[in-house]
Amino acid sequence: MAEVSSAPVRRPFHRRRKTCPFSGANAPRIDYKDVRLLQRYISERGKIVPSRITAVSQKKQRELAQAIKRARFLGLLPYIVS
């Protein structure tokens, strides 16, 4: 006879896919002058946070990176966080 385990059967856990914060009707525009918005996408070490963590779409991630680099060049954001 086959043994039946007494452990409950678990359903697989599916994490809900995050949506891009820059896509949609009321989404903020990516602008190099908006330092507060850009700082949310920079790590404590001063690196640009990858899109797999922030759930930003590929197109908007490129725009975001370009805006951060432009703000750094103009002196609005630091290159190195001290």
Curated annotation (Swiss-Prot):
Top-level division of the source organism's lineage: Bacteria
Keywords in alphabetical order: Ribonucleoprotein, Ribosomal protein, RNA-binding, rRNA-binding
One Pfam family, short name: Ribosomal_S18
GO terms under cellular component: cytosolic small ribosomal subunit
Molecular functions (GO terms): small ribosomal subunit rRNA binding; structural constituent of ribosome
Signal sequence, start to end: none
InterPro entries to which the protein is assigned, alphabetical: Ribosomal_bS18, Ribosomal_bS18_CS, Ribosomal_bS18_sf
GO biological process: translation
Tagged with keyword Ribonucleoprotein: yes
Reported function: Binds as a heterodimer with protein bS6 to the central domain of the 16S rRNA, where it helps stabilize the platform of the 30S subunit.
Family, per entry: Belongs to the bacterial ribosomal protein bS18 family.
PANTHER family for this protein: 30S RIBOSOMAL PROTEIN S18, SMALL RIBOSOMAL SUBUNIT PROTEIN BS18M
Protein's recorded name: Small ribosomal subunit protein bS18
Source species: Rhizobium meliloti (strain 1021) (Ensifer meliloti)
